[in-house]
Amino acid sequence: MTMSVNKSTLVLKVGGALMQCEMGMARLMETAAKMIASGQQLIMVHGGGCLVEEQLTANGMTTEKLDGLRVTPQEQVPVIVGALAGTSNKILQGAAIKAGVTCVGMSLGDGDMVSAKVKDPRLGFVGEVSPKSATYLEFILSQGWMPIVSSIAIDAAGQLLNVNADQAATVLAKLVDGKLVLLSDVSGVLDGKGQLIKSLNRSQVEELTNIGVIEKGMKVKVEAALEVAESMGQPVQVASWRHAEQLIALSNGEAVGTQIQPD
């Protein structure tokens, strides 16, 4: 299959809520199949917060968060790895295969894609990753396959680390010089009245964070988007998987959801 070289790779980050919505997954994967057939290279990066919560509860464990980031104590690592690199990854792979997408399920630990280290000892086994080698990803993309990547990384000492999926997607977008799209179950960043904000830069984000309009999970998402927008000098989209068909417009250069702008 010959791939078009003029479209940059789209890195789609999806959240755990998608996996609880079969129709949403089906629509997203059907859209992905159309985009890949038209020569668009896609990488999907996923979290799986809801599944992680379910598994922790089933194991009698509780979740603690610090500034919107999950704290990962040693005893929770096997459960979190199983929920993310195992169940969540394979649920998405199943939906992709059903829609006719040839995909490769993997984690951040594969193919020397990233280097990983502990982010902050207060967060336990939470990792921070930086881009390393694009060779493995580029080979998979060159075949017309879609990588589906869980946010589990492995450091140089072999320690498994839980990485925030928004940060994971940011690093993979840098690695392949692609466009980052953060998909969640809301259509983008909403103002205090629930209206979609079409475009934001750093000073506007800081202002909305200070008055409590952007908080918790959306704060982490917007900060990840700002980081990649500024380091790559191009806008990042925050949009909804509920309107997957909009991604085709995005791949044609149109704006959807909220555009996070580099200053």
UniProtKB/Swiss-Prot annotation:
Residue spans crossing the bilayer: none
Biological process (GO), any one: L-arginine biosynthetic process
The EC number(s) this enzyme carries: 2.7.2.8
Annotated positions binding substrate: 48-49, 70, 162
Pfam families named among the record's database cross-references: AA_kinase
Cell location: Cytoplasm
Keyword RNA-binding assigned: no
This protein's UniProt keywords: Amino-acid biosynthesis, Arginine biosynthesis, ATP-binding, Cytoplasm, Kinase, Nucleotide-binding, Transferase
Enzyme class at the top of the EC tree: transferase
Pathway where it operates: Amino-acid biosynthesis; L-arginine biosynthesis; N(2)-acetyl-L-ornithine from L-glutamate: step 2/4
Sites marked Transition state stabilizer: 13, 221
GO molecular function: acetylglutamate kinase activity; ATP binding
Catalyzed reactions: N-acetyl-L-glutamate + ATP = N-acetyl-L-glutamyl 5-phosphate + ADP
One term under GO cellular component: cytoplasm
HAMAP family hit by this protein: ArgB (MF_00082)
Entry-linked PANTHER family: N-ACETYLGLUTAMATE SYNTHASE, N-ACETYLGLUTAMATE SYNTHASE, MITOCHONDRIAL
Role according to the record: Catalyzes the ATP-dependent phosphorylation of N-acetyl-L-glutamate.
Family named by the database record: Belongs to the acetylglutamate kinase family. ArgB subfamily.
Protein's recorded name: Acetylglutamate kinase
